[in-house]
């Protein structure tokens, strides 16, 4: 947490909603078990920290409850600090309902972990065996964050996982004098009734395979496992972007998107590829990158059947079929299918050549052009013809060479119908029809239609 967040936490004005990061189901499927455990541990740690320091929601609710009781002439009660914030609880419940959480398939191992944890429990309070999953998760979380005081926070959140969000109203309680008196818990009863009415409103919602209710978006019909996830989704329809970047002022609909964006300013790249060591700002980018090592290509074009390792690459490829060119140059009006191609094109206008050859000092506007050029120095010829075994430094030259074997002549003159195997051959031929002579001799001023003719002519002056 930042220093500003720490200060706000001390003042009791931070809620779990302010710091919670919620994944969509698509994003969640991209995480492996270790990453899911780390995410869960961080969320549980934040929840425990905020509830132990005093949630902003609880502060508002307690003030309202004290005011209500005072207006009715009732004595104020001291709310135990261990009470959980009822507004933040559903958010954590949504997180714990995500499928495939570590620990869901380890009930036997969970019991043994609970037993081990009980042996070291300084409070001496036994953990209930019917909370195997939650106990196991907290045990693992404690391993990930050794500084977290598990003994202090575990009972609170265990009660949360047993759905003790709205405690049953007690009819009687013992007074300090030892007498029994009727408890006036009307404020809590009203809250319980409110929760009950919300459940009735959602009774028509569809259910998951295990019987849990889903929350359905009234705009598009999409369903979600938790109300908080639904609230986040609905910002797609409303356009609401409540999270602002303090560095550039850009707004985002989710805190997770803001956190990803902030790394642009900080330069942080916390996700490292175990194969090649490359670093990424987002976990989804790392997952996409790792497919280059595994060879997985799950995204297939419905038009031509070509497969890609990344969804973004498929989206770019589809523009070949649709002809869409959404990126326009403000200087000359030319349009491009990809933003990267537009950025390369702009260097024609600016003259910027950021890629320099270390061997000869020649500069290039594109990195790919530099790589091709460097093969002049290294002699590398990675592209080999399967027909004759001849090798080439560039794939485009290999494609042109293959036409010798296939006899393909894809470039046809619109004037006379003559065909050529290379585009350069067609361009040279078209000069015959236009009469253009762009190649001029510096010595005598004679002009020629082809560069080769000029070179042959210049030998007359050099003789």
Curated annotation (Swiss-Prot):
* Cysteines joined through disulfide linkages: none
Instruction: Report the locations given in the UniProt record.
Output: Nucleus
The record's family statement is:
Belongs to the krueppel C2H2-type zinc-finger protein family.
Please tell me in which tissues this protein is expressed: Expressed in ovary and liver, and at lower levels in brain and muscle.
Q: Which domain of life is it from?
A: Eukaryota
Q: Where is the composition biased (Polar residues)?
A: 192-201
Instruction: Show the PANTHER family listed in the entry.
Output: C2H2-TYPE DOMAIN-CONTAINING PROTEIN-RELATED, KRUEPPEL-LIKE TRANSCRIPTION FACTOR
Q: Which UniProt keywords are given for this protein, alphabetically ordered?
A: DNA-binding, Metal-binding, Nucleus, Repeat, Repressor, Transcription, Transcription regulation, Zinc, Zinc-finger
Q: Where are the zinc fingers (C2H2-type)?
A: 215-237, 243-265, 271-293, 299-321, 327-349, 355-377, 383-405, 411-433, 439-461
Q: What is this protein called?
A: Zinc finger protein interacting with ribonucleoprotein K
Taken from the UniProt entry, a GO cellular component term is: nucleus
GO MF annotations in UniProt: DNA binding; zinc ion binding
Segments of this protein annotated with the region Disordered: 106-128, 171-211
Q: Where is the KRAB domain?
A: 14-89
Ranges of biased composition (kind: Basic and acidic residues):
174-191
């Amino acid at each position: 947490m930042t220093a500003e967040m720490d200060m706000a936490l001390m003042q009791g004005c931070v809620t779990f909603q302010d710091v919670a990061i919620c994944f969509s189901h698509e994003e969640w499927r991209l995480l492996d078990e270790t990453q899911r455990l780390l995410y869960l541990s961080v969320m549980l740690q934040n929840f425990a920290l905020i509830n132990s320091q005093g949630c902003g929601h609880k502060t508002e609710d307690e003030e309202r409850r004290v005011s209500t009781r005072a207006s009715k002439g009732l004595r104020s009660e001291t709310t135990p600090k261990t009470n959980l914030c009822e507004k933040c609880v559903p958010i954590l419940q949504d997180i714990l309902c995500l499928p495939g959480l570590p620990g869901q398939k380890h009930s036997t191992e969970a019991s043994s972990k609970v037993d081990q944890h009980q042996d070291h429990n300084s409070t001496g309070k036994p953990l209930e065996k019917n909370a195997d999953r939650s106990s196991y998760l907290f045990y693992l979380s404690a391993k990930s964050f050794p500084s977290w005081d598990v003994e202090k926070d575990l009972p609170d959140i265990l009660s949360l996982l047993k759905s003790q969000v709205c405690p049953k109203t007690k009819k009687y309680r013992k007074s300090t004098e030892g007498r029994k008196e009727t408890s006036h818990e009307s404020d809590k009863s009203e809250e319980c009734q409110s929760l009950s009415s919300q459940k009735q409103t959602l009774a028509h919602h569809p259910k998951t395979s295990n019987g849990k209710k889903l929350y359905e978006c009234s705009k598009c019909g999409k369903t979600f496992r938790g109300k908080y996830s639904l609230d986040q989704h609905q910002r797609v329809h409303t356009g609401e972007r409540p999270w602002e970047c303090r560095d550039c002022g850009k707004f985002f609909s989710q805190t997770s998107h803001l956190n990803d964006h902030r790394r642009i300013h900080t330069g942080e790249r916390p996700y490292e590829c175990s194969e090649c060591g490359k670093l990424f700002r987002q976990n989804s980018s790392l997952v996409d990158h790792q497919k280059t090592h595994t060879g997985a290509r799950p995204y297939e074009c419905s038009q031509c059947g070509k497969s890609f390792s990344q969804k973004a690459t498929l989206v770019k490829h589809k523009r070949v079929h649709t002809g869409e060119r959404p990126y326009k140059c403000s200087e000359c009006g030319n349009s491009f299918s990809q933003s990267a191609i537009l950025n390369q094109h702009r260097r024609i206008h600016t003259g910027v050549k950021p890629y320099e050859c270390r061997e000869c000092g020649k500069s290039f506007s594109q990195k790919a052009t530099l790589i091709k050029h460097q093969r002049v120095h290294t002699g590398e010829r990675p592209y080999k013809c399967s027909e004759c075994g001849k090798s080439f430094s560039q794939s485009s030259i290999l494609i042109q060479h293959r036409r010798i074997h296939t006899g393909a002549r894809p470039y046809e003159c619109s004037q006379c119908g003559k065909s050529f195997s290379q585009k350069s051959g067609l361009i040279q031929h078209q000069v015959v029809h236009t009469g253009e002579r762009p190649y001029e001799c510096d010595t005598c001023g004679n002009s020629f239609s082809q560069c080769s003719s000029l070179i042959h002519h210049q030998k007359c002056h050099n003789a």
